Amino acid sequence: MARMHTRKRGRSGSKRIEVRERPSWIQYSDDEIKEMIVKMRKQGMTKSMIGIRLRDQYAIPGTRPVLHMKLGQVLKENNLESDVPEDLQALIERYKRAMKHLSLNKHDMNNKRKAQLIMSKMLRLIRYYKRTSRLPQDWSLERVLQ
């Protein structure tokens, strides 16, 4: 499938193996894994960073076969889910960096175009999240950007 704002094709990548039962090498109980997730989230880590740390340091390939629930559901149970979805938050930070660069380099037209593409991607995501009720209908991007 093609990329959104370019004529290039997408990148191929490895797919995660579908595992339905708990792997035998995991030495942590369900409660210990949930405590690790909550602790990492309270340290300020995002969901993807938590998943990477669980995979690389604790040899837990995913929370679904182990806990029978997704990582976001564990965070939702403990009221630690962020108000803004992670992918939208990353786009907002990218846009802020691009605008900071543009304020210092006013004639950088390539970066101006990239900032426009980031903004259109953010607006598309916001429409989707409002439609699926992940964001409230009165949520405003302007409040976040200032």
UniProtKB/Swiss-Prot annotation:
Keyword field: Ribonucleoprotein, Ribosomal protein
SMART domains: Ribosomal_S13_N (SM01386), Ribosomal_S15 (SM01387)
UniProt GO molecular function: small ribosomal subunit rRNA binding; structural constituent of ribosome
Superkingdom in the source lineage: Archaea
Keyword Methyltransferase: no
GO biological process: translation
GO cellular component: a single term: cytosolic small ribosomal subunit
Gene3D superfamilies: 4.10.860.130, S15/NS1, RNA-binding
One Pfam family named in its UniProt record: Ribosomal_S15
Family per record: Belongs to the universal ribosomal protein uS15 family.
UniProt subunit comment: Part of the 30S ribosomal subunit.
Name the record gives this protein: Small ribosomal subunit protein uS15
Organism listed in the record: Picrophilus torridus (strain ATCC 700027 / DSM 9790 / JCM 10055 / NBRC 100828 / KAW 2/3)
